[in-house]
């Protein structure tokens, strides 16, 4: 294993996605192996599992490291999102291995919602498939702007550059149409480790970095809202002398003395204290869990948003939004639903579906319902106003 180090490493959250059988789990398992993150006993267990799954074989089946569910191992596919945590000498990683089958697209979307970057796999024999386009569209919808394109199974096409290049060009064109600003492409053969952790001797025509080196060095700026926002998770009232409002800051920063507004609404106050388990802070920023006390009593409940008084979030009880429908039953206009945003849950109705989107062509199509895994642009009506922002500005709100 990699020698322990006390150096502070940056953290990269990424997903592996693409169509079924493109080799996502194998690639991720190989990446863990090449990063030196598999202890000897786990390698021995992997060898036993590989022999059990492939009697008479002599190659490690790296997909078994991440395909944890029995149903997945038996079918040779990924159903659930498998999360792994590992590090190299330069960086720490949280990776979500996402399922490739269309019926599990909602699982993939869940993984993508927490990722800074996507590693999209394409089988060199098949090129771009509908599910490749679907996953790329969802990544773009959820704010992922940098993608690593891994054209896998190059060993099965004799490592030919003239097969790799058209796939790279076609994907780059698709990504540009969806607003993905950077595509880093490389040819790999996950089973043998070509260009995963070490450069491939079979593809001298490729002189770029390996996948591991690319993940270690790529610069990704996560979405960070500039304006202060904190959804209230609970009102902390241990006794009559203390009333605080606890939550995790999802945007910007706040200092003692700053003027805030409670949303939805117009009630204003100033921050008296920023309380944590380690004592009071003079200032707090996005990602920190804190308790705020105010200089006067204000009616605040769970789900309200404490925001910068000079730059509050928009408020409305009607708006339009893109929806990726994850329910087994279809979404129908004017049926009652729950809408959860931040720490608030309220009654909602989709008053109309303006159109649904063909994720393969990005065409807008007429629709009267949304089925599982379909994306639509919908008008939404709420019982009362909420504070909200565009996903690209603040994913929490």
What kind of region is each of these model predictions?
Residues 2-17, 22-25, 88-89, 239-397:
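C-terminal effector/interaction modules appended to NTPase cores
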Residues 2-4, 53-58, 67-79, 175-183, ...:
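Active-site phosphate-binding and catalytic loops of NTP-dependent enzymes
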Residues 3-103, 115:
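P-loop NTPase switch module centered on the Walker A-proximal segment
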Residues 21, 27, 46, 76, ...:
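Residue-level signature of catalytic and energy-coupling elements of molecular machines
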Residues 22, 33-34, 101-102, 125-129, ...:
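Conserved nucleotide-binding/hydrolysis micro-motifs of P-loop NTPases
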Residues 27-31, 42-45, 107, 131-138, ...:
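Alpha-helical scaffold elements adjacent to nucleotide-binding pockets in ATP/GTP-utilizing enzyme cores
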Residues 91-94, 98-104, 112-136, 142-165:
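Conserved Switch II/interswitch segment of TRAFAC-class P-loop GTPases
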Residues 145, 157-227:
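Canonical P-loop GTPase G-domain recognition
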């Amino acid at each position: 294993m990699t020698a322990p180090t006390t150096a502070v490493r940056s953290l990269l959250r990424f997903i592996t996605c693409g169509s079924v059988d493109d080799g996502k789990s194998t690639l991720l398992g190989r990446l863990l192996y090449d990063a030196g993150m598999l202890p000897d006993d786990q390698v021995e267990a992997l060898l036993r599992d590989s022999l059990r799954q492939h009697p008479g074989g002599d190659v490690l089946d790296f997909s078994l490291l991440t395909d944890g569910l029995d149903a997945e191992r038996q079918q040779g596919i990924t159903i659930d999102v498998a999360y792994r945590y590992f590090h190299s000498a330069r960086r720490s990683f949280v990776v979500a291995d996402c399922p490739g089958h269309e019926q599990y697209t909602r699982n993939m979307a869940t993984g993508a919602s927490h990722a800074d970057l996507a590693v999209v796999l394409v089988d060199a024999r098949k090129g771009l498939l509908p599910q490749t386009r679907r996953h790329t569209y969802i990544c773009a919808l959820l704010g992922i702007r940098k993608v690593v394109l891994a054209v896998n199974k190059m060993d099965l096409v004799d490592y030919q550059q003239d097969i790799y290049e058209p796939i790279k060009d076609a994907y780059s064109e698709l990504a540009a149409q969806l607003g993905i600003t950077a595509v880093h492409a490389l040819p790999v053969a996950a089973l043998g480790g070509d260009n995963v952790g070490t450069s491939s001797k079979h593809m001298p025509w490729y002189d770029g970095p390996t996948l591991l080196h690319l993940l270690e060095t790529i610069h990704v700026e996560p979405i960070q809202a500039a304006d202060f926002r904190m959804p209230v998770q609970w009102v902390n009232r241990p006794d009559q002398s203390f009333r605080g409002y606890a939550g995790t800051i999802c945007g910007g920063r706040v200092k003692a003395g700053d003027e805030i507004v409670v949303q939805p609404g117009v009630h204003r106050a100033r921050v008296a204290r920023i309380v944590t388990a380690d004592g009071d802070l003079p200032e707090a920023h996005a990602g920190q869990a804190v308790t705020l006390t105010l200089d006067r009593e204000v009616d605040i409940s769970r789900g309200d948003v404490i925001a910068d008084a000079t730059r509050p979030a928009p408020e409305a009880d009607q708006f339009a939004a893109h929806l990726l429908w994850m329910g087994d039953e279809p979404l129908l206009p004017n049926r009652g639903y729950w809408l959860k945003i931040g720490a608030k849950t309220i009654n909602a109705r989709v008053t109309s579906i303006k159109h649904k989107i063909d994720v393969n062509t990005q065409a807008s199509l007429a629709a009267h319902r949304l089925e599982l895994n379909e994306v639509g642009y919908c008008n939404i009506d709420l019982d009362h106003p909420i504070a909200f922002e565009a996903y690209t500005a603040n994913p929490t709100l």
